[in-house]
């Protein structure tokens, strides 16, 4: 089982490390043709507008949409969550539109407002250390979206079908439980496809 990490920008090596430490084969994705090699994909944190520009530059938008529409699992963290949103507050449309949610960018403020919190993430982990850096917030979700975690009453982790997304950076700690939960999602999907 192979899991790709979109390697255009952002915390790529940290995701690779946690995936590898959890027993998955992890590869950096830089070209559209590489998506065919992987069973699941991580859209890492970084800067969402820069990431979107690079996605367009390398003609990855349509292949990423098709990857998600095929039912293969995708995990988005921080900027990745923004890319997965159907709607961005104050803007017309989201980017990939995989999750029926309204997201507000930089809702927790700029870099100096970075902080850590301990969260319970439903079905994933209790007391997970979450690192927030200029983090987005999920302001609203549709009826098919499962809220997995909240911080001070604000939604910070969601799941819809084969899509998992969080406002924080799970890759910036040594706690691999969110990655392990994602690996399990990918493994279960791979078993279904094999039958």
Curated annotation (Swiss-Prot):
EC number(s) from the headed UniProt entry: 4.3.3.6, 3.5.1.2
Membrane-spanning segments: none
Active-site residues, Swiss-Prot/TrEMBL: 78, 169, 171
Keywords (A to Z) from UniProt: Glutamine amidotransferase, Hydrolase, Lyase, Pyridoxal phosphate
Reactions catalysed, as given in the entry: aldehydo-D-ribose 5-phosphate + D-glyceraldehyde 3-phosphate + L-glutamine = pyridoxal 5'-phosphate + L-glutamate + phosphate + 3 H2O + H(+); L-glutamine + H2O = L-glutamate + NH4(+)
Family: Belongs to the glutaminase PdxT/SNO family.
Protein name: Pyridoxal 5'-phosphate synthase subunit PdxT
Record organism: Shouchella clausii (strain KSM-K16) (Alkalihalobacillus clausii)
């Amino acid at each position: 089982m192979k899991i790709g990490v979109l390697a255009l920008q952002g915390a790529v090596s940290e995701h690779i490390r946690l995936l590898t430490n959890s027993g998955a084969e992890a590869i950096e994705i830089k070209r559209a043709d590489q998506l065919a090699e992987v069973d699941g994909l991580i859209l890492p944190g970084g800067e969402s507008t820069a990431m979107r520009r690079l996605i367009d530059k390398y003609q990855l938008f349509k292949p990423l949409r098709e990857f998600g529409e095929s039912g293969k699992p995708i995990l988005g963290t921080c900027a990745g969550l923004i890319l997965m949103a159907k709607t961005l507050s104050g803007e017309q449309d989201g980017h990939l539109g995989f999750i029926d949610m309204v997201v507000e960018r930089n809702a927790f403020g700029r870099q100096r407002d970075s902080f850590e919190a301990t969260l319970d993430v439903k079905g994933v982990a209790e007391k997970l250390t979450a690192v927030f850096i200029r983090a987005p917030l999920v302001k609203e979700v549709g009826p098919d979206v499962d809220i997995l975690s909240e911080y001070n009453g604000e939604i910070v982790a969601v799941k819809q079908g084969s899509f998992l997304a969080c406002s924080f950076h799970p890759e910036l700690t040594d706690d691999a439980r969110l990655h392990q939960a994602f690996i399990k999602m990918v493994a279960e999907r791979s078993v279904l496809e094999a039958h």
